[in-house]
């Protein structure tokens, strides 16, 4: 029990469980004994009906649309806390990770387009390498233990949070179609109600969650991706402490283990099961997986390092205290771990086009993320001071 408690107390535990879930999915999807069970689980129909309202989806879509909304709720809470009280609370504090995140989204997307611009179908996946998996990246960093400067951890967390926020904006602007104005009207009313609750300083989290469920349903029916509802709810839950209690911080504390140890591993298990049947060298070196691998492995660190270097040269920002530029470059490599967020965007980009494209995209994401994790860990390990 002591070893189990120590494992779950470690910052690396969430990343390790994610890896186990992804490997298990790959094994089950490629085993003659378990592939049928694996796909049957994902295709299991789940229906929810309240009066005339009906939501009928398979298990995979419930995981991607409903459970991931809880993950985005946690992201919303984290972003709000960092903006109001944390590492993004002042312009000077926020400048360096914001500039790094912008470079880390623009350059990978451009590199992907350099490979895929000639194909109008695969071109739609330009945002896939722009994402960072915050749980995986922090998990790999945590494997280095106390050798990692606190400022470097905060920089990676702030960068990844801004990156996630950028991914949310990209999803809202570029991966949304067939809008229902009635449902959008209901969603707008729910958002106004959340704002009123916040202005009236209503501190019961359950009320916000109840309105959030209405918002999620309306957004789902509107054609906008339903996970965005989670972020919106997170922004409106009160952060300010009263009588020593903060509803936002308390909910963040409650949600964190559920997201780290259940929701993200379940998402990884449901989405990382890529069949290797029919995979050839020609396929792996085709423009789609190559563009993703190049975007994650080369574009991410190049964009982050280049934009950070320019920010320092132009005196727009300064290095986090106690860090060196080579360590920032190593963190840039770790940010190439796209995994869950990249897979999520790939499912939006190609979900209604061709399942084979999603398969090739996932392979590119898995290879690019794995290489980024190994190289980033190795490079950073050689550039950190040993523990005395």
UniProtKB/Swiss-Prot annotation:
Record-annotated membrane-spanning stretches: 14-34, 59-79, 95-115, 125-145, 154-174, 179-199, 219-239, 254-274, 287-307, 328-348, 356-376
Domain of life per record: Bacteria
State the InterPro entries in the record. Na/H_antiporter_dom_sf, NhaA
Any one GO molecular function term? sodium:proton antiporter activity
Task: State a single Pfam family of this protein.
Answer: Na_H_antiport_1
Keywords noted in UniProt: Antiport, Cell inner membrane, Cell membrane, Ion transport, Membrane, Sodium, Sodium transport, Transmembrane, Transmembrane helix, Transport
> What does the entry list under GO cellular component?
plasma membrane
The record's subcellular locations are:
Cell inner membrane
Q: Name one GO biological process term.
A: regulation of pH
Q: Which reaction does it catalyse?
A: Na(+)(in) + 2 H(+)(out) = Na(+)(out) + 2 H(+)(in)
The membrane topology term of the UniProt record is: Multi-pass membrane protein
Q: Which family does it belong to?
A: Belongs to the NhaA Na(+)/H(+) (TC 2.A.33) antiporter family.
Q: What does this protein do?
A: Na(+)/H(+) antiporter that extrudes sodium in exchange for external protons.
The entry's protein name is Na(+)/H(+) antiporter NhaA
Species in which this protein is naturally found: Citrobacter koseri (strain ATCC BAA-895 / CDC 4225-83 / SGSC4696)
């Amino acid at each position: 029990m002591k070893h189990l408690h120590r494992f779950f107390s470690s910052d690396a535990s969430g990343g390790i469980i994610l890896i186990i879930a992804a490997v298990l999915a790959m094994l089950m999807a490629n085993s003659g004994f378990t592939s049928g069970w694996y796909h049957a689980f994902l295709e299991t129909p789940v229906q929810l009906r309240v009066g005339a309202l009906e939501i009928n989806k398979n298990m995979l879509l419930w995981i991607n649309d409903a459970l991931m909304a809880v993950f985005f709720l946690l992201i919303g809470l984290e972003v709000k806390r960092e903006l109001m009280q944390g590492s993004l609370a002042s312009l000077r504090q926020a400048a360096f990770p914001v500039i790094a995140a912008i470079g880390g989204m623009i350059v990978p997307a451009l590199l992907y387009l350099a490979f895929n611009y000639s194909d109008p179908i695969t071109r739609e996946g330009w945002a896939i390498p722009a994402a960072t998996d915050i749980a995986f990246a922090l998990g790999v960093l945590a494997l280095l233990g106390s050798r990692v400067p606190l400022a470097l951890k905060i920089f990676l967390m702030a960068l990844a949070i801004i990156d996630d926020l950028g991914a949310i904006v990209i999803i809202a602007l570029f991966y949304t179609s067939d809008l229902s104005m009635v449902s959008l009207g209901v969603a707008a009313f729910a958002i106004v109600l959340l704002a009123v609750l916040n202005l009236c300083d209503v501190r019961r989290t359950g009320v916000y969650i109840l309105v959030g469920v209405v918002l999620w349903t309306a957004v789902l029916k509107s054609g906008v991706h339903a996970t965005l509802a989670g972020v919106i709810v997170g922004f409106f839950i009160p952060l300010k402490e009263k009588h020593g209690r903060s509803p936002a911080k308390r909910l963040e504390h409650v949600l964190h283990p559920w997201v780290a140890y259940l929701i993200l591993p379940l998402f990884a298990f449901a989405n990382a099961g890529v069949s290797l049947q029919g995979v050839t060298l020609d396929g792996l070196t085709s423009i789609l997986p190559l563009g993703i691998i190049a975007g994650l492995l080369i574009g991410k660190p190049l964009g982050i390092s280049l934009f950070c270097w320019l920010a320092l040269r132009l005196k727009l920002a300064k290095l986090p205290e106690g860090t060196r530029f080579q360590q920032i470059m190593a963190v840039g490599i770790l940010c190439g771990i796209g995994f869950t967020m990249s897979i999520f965007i790939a499912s939006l980009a190609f979900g209604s086009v061709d399942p084979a494209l999603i398969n090739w995209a996932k392979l590119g994401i898995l290879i690019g993320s794995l290489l980024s994790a190994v190289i980033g860990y190795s490079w950073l390990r050689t550039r950190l001071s040993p523990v005395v």
